[in-house]
Structure formats: structure tokens, C-alpha cells
Amino acid sequence: MTILNHTLGFPRVGLRRELKKAQESYWAGNSTREELLAVGRELRARHWDQQKQAGIDLLPVGDFAWYDHVLTTSLLLGNVPARHQNKDGSVDIDTLFRIGRGRAPTGEPAAAAEMTKWFNTNYHYMVPEFVKGQQFKLTWTQLLEEVDEALALGHNVKPVLLGPVTWLWLGKVKGEQFDRLSLLNDILPVYQQVLAELEKRGIEWVQIDEPALVLELPQAWLDAYKPAYDALQGQVKLLLTTYFEGVTPNLDTITALPVQGLHVDLVHGKDGVAELHKRLPSDWLLSAGLINGRNVWRADLTEKYAQIKDIVGKRDLWVASSCSLLHSPIDLSVETRLDAEVKSWFAFALQKCHELALLRDALNSGDTAALAEWSAPIQARRHSTRVHNPAVEKRLAAITAQDSQRANVYEVRAEAQRARFKLPAWPTTTIGSFPQTTEIRTLRLDFKKGNLDANNYRTGIAEHIKQAIVEQERLGLDVLVHGEAERNDMVEYFGEHLDGFVFTQNGWVQSYGSRCVKPPIVIGDVSRPAPITVEWAKYAQSLTDKPVKGMLTGPVTILCWSFPREDVSRETIAKQIALALRDEVADLEAAGIGIIQIDEPALREGLPLRRSDWDAYLQWGVEAFRINAAVAKDDTQIHTHMCYCEFNDIMDSIAALDADVITIETSRSDMELLESFEEFDYPNEIGPGVYDIHSPNVPSVEWIEALLKKAAKRIPAERLWVNPDCGLKTRGWPETRAALANMVQAAQNLRRG
């Protein structure tokens, strides 16, 4: 029984973000569709070759996506919302882009599909939309074309397909409500057709992703798996693929399915290898997800070997990444600025492929010398002074309950804040960032490269902040922001100013569409050596009589959007960050900043996948936020911002944050998120986002007014704020001015009644 290795997927964007650049060039009309398609072909060929050269046996095909793999699956099935359809009924790449971003070089603009987090990761998918009576057919053959490409290049191909039950689980019913699970029998013939086409091409194994099987699914959904896979059996071998958690609670459902193999995430799940071996059918292949696809740390291969060695020779076995390497940067070798000690602790996607090759070879030969050599830096890290800071650990141990309590309750604070700020009804504000123009990015880049001295850099940033204040005053906004011209990314910026973080030059990972982020890496105990945001906030406030918000990224979001340490708990990291940012709140307040926003867009996405594990996470997540904020005086107004959230199931925790104002993303969901706040009788102030900043479309005054009136039916108008869904960093100034002017006009109309 020779052991093989494989990856569940590979990063799509390219080492230099070639896909992002090609997408944005095409969207802007600066390149042709053929040029865009050529970039995709080149990236796929390169990535297959890189994996092969790194020692991967079975190459994933179908993991590439022009925007998002869930959206690719929707198009495969012919699931195109009516508003995005071509007049002749055809589907092309512009159809895909209209669904993802609301517009494309061809076709009429229309509201983009809803976007939300992919399980508990920082990747976003486009939510499939279902309507009663809709029909499905094989429409978008990207998977088959890419399989043909890979076969023509001589590769050993393992197609990747999002499974039917998970795809339905991820979607939402629009219009007249019905059970979306009732669509399962309608989509299975398309899956059968795809599998038949793959069989014709000589494919032996298909990786069919059903990550919903790690969730606490309703019984009806669990029961749907058997008839679904009965319908799909017999054409090619199916590797049922799960990730992000273990499968033990649903193993009885899984073992009844007519598949030939199971992939299990042995990094994030608690499944024991011996128990899996005992309970899986003896003729099934086990794909062991031993290498963490979601982090950047070098694996302790001696430990991984010990974890799996007892079943070697007892069943067919593959070793694999825990999940797709989509969530990891591509190549550590191009990082020239990391110091050698720290660099030796990491492994990016290509290095993880090498780890899989080392592990496969050791399991096949029994020779573990190479594993011990690879794992040596991990032992050294455990004792490094770069990791441990006794002062931070002492401060963390001394936290008391009082450290997470504001001095008075919201009602008392609100009175003090009303007296201080005297804001009108329907107060208008933005979420924080303004367009990151070419001039701003060039300014930062020149400074970073040493082509610009500190004085000229600061003069340039000050000018952009001044422009942002002037623009906001001209528009008539009530609470202003400084625009964040000095910030490259809301998490990276703070990480750069906190001890305990390191950064990469090219450690890009895809967030959604063409949006890429370069997450900081937490390597040690976190502390704040000096104030971070105070200088620019104070300068912005000096330019206006209106209040200017101080802008912080909250501790849970910094944790969730960074690559965390693996040697301490996430709770420990979050509370260390909270203590560092608590000092920042105190310094902002002392500098005269009266409104401080602590963004926590990632609070919900950090939830464990199983509801039974939620309480512990929410307890420390809320406590971290409160430690961060509780130092503020009564007349300092604390805002928080959250996006891509469904709130129903965590309303107790949202209220427990005790923020004076919460702003949320609601426009894509047509204000339906406010239902949670209404039913809960949320006591504090709320700013429901009135337009979608992810789309370049400008909302009309009437549209915004209608949304606000809808909001006022659920939340008393005196507690409503008016704001966009999210920061405006990715937008251009023309559409930003137009949208904000309409937003302010809508608020003024409502004030007049």
C-alpha cells in the first residue's frame, strides 16, 4: 500500500497578485477578456507545476476561481439570479462578475449577490440565491475545461467539486419562502452529468467537498446525504472531503455513504486516527489532513508521523493539507526581509507541499531522519526570547473583573454624550476609511522603500487627512473621520506598531474577488511600545469643530485576521492585544478625542463551527472588547462596527459588548439583520449600513430613505445612525462623493419629516 500525498487546493492569486491585477485591469476596460483568460491559464499551469515540483502526487483541478469557488459552482449548475442574466440566456465570465460585484464590462449593472464568510475563515463566498420553481442545468463548464488543460500538460489530476448538500446549505431563499433542501433532487442530475464527463476523461478520483459535515446539522440535512450520494455513486471514485473541524459526531452518517474515501482535518478536529480507522469501512481510503492549510507555521513532522504511523499498511492512506492552501501565502522563499531565526519557524503553501512530500517519503520508507531535521527550528522557538515577554504575561495575569466594566450604564453615558456632542436626529457618519488613491498608495510605498523622508511623508499624509475633513464638511456629515490615509490595512497597520508581530513582503491571501490581504503573523507576546493613532486623530480634530472619531481595530478582529501563534490559546492573544489597545483608548481620550470606534467585524466569524463550543469563545471575545473599551469616561462615546454578520444567535453577546453605538452591514440583506435587534430589544444606538460599498453603484436618495424608513419600523428613530455598510477604502472619490451626498440628503429629508 503505497502512500500518496495531495493538496485540497492551492492559492489562486499568484505570487505577485497577478490575478488581482488582471481582474481589475479587465473591469476597468484596460484589457480584453482574452488577456484576462490568458492570465488564468498561465497561473493554473504555473501552480500545477510548482506543486508537482514540490513533490505532490495528485494535483487539485477546479480549485481556481475567477471570483469565488462557490460562485463557480452556482454557475456550473445554472444558478444565475434573474437580475444578472444575459438577455439571450447565455452565461459568460461577465455574468459571474455581475453576480460578484454588481457590474461587469458588459451587461446591465444590478445589485451584487450577498457575500459572507466561508465557514470560520477570512475568505468570503457569494451566497447562492434560490427561488421557488427554479431549474438547473449544466451551464458553466470551467471545471471540465481546466481538467482538459491539466491532462494536456501531463498531470495526475484530481478534480475538486463543491458537494451538492454543502452548496445548498450555503445558499439563501429569496422571495416566497420554501425549504431549499427540496432543490437537492433537481441539482443531482447536473452533478451526475459532471461526474460522467470526468469519467470519460479517465479521471479516477474526484475530491467532492462537503465541509457542512463538520457542522451540527439539522437531522433533515444529515438524512439528505445518503440519497444524494446514492445518486452519485458508480461513475468515478469519490473522496468525500471535510475540513475546519472533526467529523466524529456525524461519522455514522458518513460511513453509510457509497463513497470510496474520506478526507478528515486532523489539525482542527479532535478525531482520533485509531478511532477513524476502526469505524471507517475497511476498503475506504483515508486522506489524513495533517498539514495546517490555514496557518504559516512549520509543522512538527515528527509529531505528525507519530500521529498516523500506527495505521500505515492497514488501509489505503493519503497524506494531505488539512484544507485548501487557499488560506496560506504562496512561497516563503521570496521573503528576503524576515530575519533568519523567525523565517525558520514558517512554511507557506509551497513549503507545506514539501512537508507533505517529506511525510509521504518517511511513511513509505520508515526513515524519519529528514523529519527530525525539518522539525528542529520548532524546538528552538519554544525557548526564544522573541516569543516570551514576562511583563505582558504578568499584566495579563493581573486582570480583574473591574477592568472590563465601564464606570456607568449606557443610559447614564448616553445623557453625558448627548450633552457633549449635541448631534441632530439621524446623525450621519462613515465607517472610517476613505478612498486609497494612487497618490496615497504611492506616498506610503515611497516612504516604505526609503525614497521619501519622514518629514515629507508626514506632510503628504497630513494633506490627505485635511482633504478628507474638507470633503466631509462640504458633504455635511455630522461625525467625521480622518480617512486613514496612513493605513495600508486595518489589521496590518496596528500589527506594525505592536510588539509581537512580524510582516511579510508577499504573504498575500485572497479575501474575496480581487481583494487580497497580507495578514500579520503573531510570533510572541503582544504589547504597545508607543501610541499608534493619537497623533493623526489629534491633527484631524484640530481642523474642524465637528467630532472626529478615533479609529481602532478591535482585539478579536486583529486576532482573527492575523496568523495566530499555535503555542498559546486564542484567548490569551486576544486579551494581550486588548490590554495594548486599552492604553491607546486612554491616550486618545486624553488628546481630546471624544468618539472612539473599535471595529470588531470579525467577532462572529471567530465562532467555533459547532454551537456547543460557542459560549466559551463569546465569553472571552466579549471580555477582550470590554477590556479594550472600559477605560473610557462616560462622555466618551464608544462605537463598534461589524460586517458580514448574522446576529440572531449572538445577540446576548453583542449587547454585552456594551458599545454606545454599533454600526452594521445591512444593505445587501435589505435590513433583515435589524430583525434580530428588534426582537432582542437592543438598548443602545445602531447605524444600519444604507448602501453596499463593495459595489461601485451609487444608491439614490429614495433608495436610502426607503431603507432608513424600513429600519425605523424596527428601531426607534432616535437611536438610529446613518452610515455606509463599511469603509470606503476600495472605492473611488467620484462615486464616494455621490453616494455620501445622497446619504446626507436622505438623512436631512427624514429630519424634515
Swiss-Prot record:
Cofactor(s) demanded: Zn(2+)
Its Gene Ontology biological processes?
A: methionine biosynthetic process; methylation
Q: How is the cofactor bound?
A: Binds 1 zinc ion per subunit.
Cysteines joined through disulfide linkages: none
Pfam families, A to Z: Meth_synt_1, Meth_synt_2
Pathway membership, UniProt: Amino-acid biosynthesis; L-methionine biosynthesis via de novo pathway; L-methionine from L-homocysteine (MetE route): step 1/1
- This entry's Enzyme Commission designation comes to 2.1.1.14
Which InterPro entries does the UniProt record give? Cbl-indep_Met_Synth_N, Cobalamin-indep_Met_synthase, Met_Synth_C/arc, UROD/MetE-like_sf
GO MF terms here are: 5-methyltetrahydropteroyltriglutamate-homocysteine S-methyltransferase activity; zinc ion binding
Catalyzed reaction equations: 5-methyltetrahydropteroyltri-L-glutamate + L-homocysteine = tetrahydropteroyltri-L-glutamate + L-methionine
Positions with a binding annotation for L-methionine: I431, G432, S433, E484, D599
Q: Gene3D superfamilies, from UniProt? A: 3.20.20.210
The entry's 5-methyltetrahydropteroyltri-L-glutamate-binding residues are R17, E18, L19, K20, K117, R515, C516, W561, E605
Provide the function of this protein: Catalyzes the transfer of a methyl group from 5-methyltetrahydrofolate to homocysteine resulting in methionine formation.
Entry protein name: 5-methyltetrahydropteroyltriglutamate--homocysteine methyltransferase
The UniProt gene name for this protein comes to metE
